[in-house]
């Protein structure tokens, strides 16, 4: 790996470290209870917000990949980071809104969070594989490693981030806002360091988005991989 790409790789992995928190927070019982109390709904209703993450991901998947190939890994990752910041800070705003539309705001923000997930996947996975081209398998395993570390630390972070509002309600807004701010910082940093695909694009003309979509072909093996991906993340 070229050492000049080391900061870029770290930025990519940090995106997924915070993603490990963002994709897990709505599954935490204490956060479900806090959000349900703020919005005046049953804790089970928070499951619909979690499902909106999947909906947003499905919405973005058909075009996130071609856009990443056309515009570059940097732009795709930047879209993902910015969208994730909107999702997390939006959750804090939704909590503060309470029963005055808070649940609906959270649902929309969760869809945006799902969209950001697709753009992070299509930007960061190929980016780290291109950076660590001699061991792309290790590069993608690093993504799972950072997610796992974040999820392992999340219970401890919840104990630190919890606060109480003026009305006596339990709030995890510091966690939402803090992670959102980190994503905003990562959004800026992604433009400051080099990526291999940016230099390659400077030396040649890439295929257009429409042409790329026309050449898309799903083989039996690719469909099988999609099914495996769906079931393994669903469990």
Kindly label every feature range from the protein language model.
Residues 2-28, 217-234:
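Pair of pore-lining "gating" transmembrane helices in MFS-fold secondary transporters
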Residues 53-62, 152:
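Residue-level signature of mid-helix packing/kink "hotspots" within the transmembrane helices
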Residues 109-145:
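Cytoplasmic helix-loop-helix junction between adjacent transmembrane helices
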């Amino acid at each position: 790996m070229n050492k000049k790409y080391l900061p870029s790789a770290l930025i990519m992995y940090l995106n997924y470290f915070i993603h490990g928190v963002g994709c897990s927070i709505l599954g935490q019982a204490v956060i479900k209870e806090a959000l349900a109390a703020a919005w005046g709904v049953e804790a089970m209703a928070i499951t619909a917000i979690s499902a909106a993450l999947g909906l947003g991901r499905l919405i973005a998947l058909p075009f996130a990949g071609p856009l990443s190939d056309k515009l570059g890994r940097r732009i795709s990752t930047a879209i993902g980071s910015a969208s994730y910041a909107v999702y997390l800070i939006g959750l804090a705003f939704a909590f503060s809104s309470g029963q005055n539309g808070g649940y609906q705001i959270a649902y929309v923000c969760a869809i945006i969070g799902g969209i950001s997930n697709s753009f992070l996947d299509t930007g960061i996975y190929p980016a780290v594989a291109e950076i660590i081209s001699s061991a792309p398998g290790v590069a993608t395993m690093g993504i799972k490693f950072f997610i796992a570390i974040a999820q392992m630390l999340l219970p401890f972070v919840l104990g630190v981030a919890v606060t109480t509002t003026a009305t006596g309600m339990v709030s995890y807004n510091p966690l939402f806002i803090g992670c959102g701010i980190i994503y905003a910082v990562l959004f800026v940093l992604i433009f400051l360091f080099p990526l291999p695909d940016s230099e390659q694009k400077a030396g040649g003309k890439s295929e257009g988005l429409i042409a790329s979509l026309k050449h898309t072909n799903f083989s039996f093996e690719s469909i099988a991989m999609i099914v495996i991906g769906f079931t393994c993340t669903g469990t």
